[in-house]
Amino acid sequence: EAIGYIQAQSEHAQELLDFISSRFSSPTLCGLLLGKAARAREKGVELYFDPACRLDRPFQPLGEQELISIIGNLLDNAIEATQRSPLPHAPVEVLIKLSDQELIIEVADQGVGIKPEIRERIFERGITTKTRGDHGIGLYLIESYVTQAGGAIEVADNTPRGAIFSLFIPATGTARQLEDTDYAT
């Protein structure tokens, strides 16, 4: 029975590795996603990656570290919100998709959700839904990175519970690219 469990875990890990490495070209992003999936699983939460996921070339409007920070913070928040839910843990759904027009990052959880009075201020520095620890910077950073790149963020309630964070970042013509062009002349 233990051998069967180990084989199943190994197969799952290999399938996830194959999926992620075939859809994301950045080794750093692949490492982040695999690490977050393993950490989530240890906490009793599964990450479900949408089959449409694809980021197979560098995304110029954001630096790799900014992209990693955005995705890492969104996943951490969703995993923690899911853990705090008293109901059985539904998977955290993840979509990271680059088209010619934009990069879409969407993370949907069925955790504890966001109270309306906090939602209005969720991107302010120091605002958090968490009760312990040093929090309140992640969403502030995400919002600043997305805004600098000329993008937008939508926060919605998930059904039947939880939250959906959707980020839309244009692939061209961003404020950052215009600044870079100014400095180059």
Can you describe what each PLM-predicted range is?
Residues 4-7, 21-43:
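Short beta-to-alpha transition helix within the HATPase_c
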Residues 89-101:
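Short beta-strand/loop element within the Bergerat-fold HATPase_c
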Residues 114-126:
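Short conserved segment of the HATPase_c
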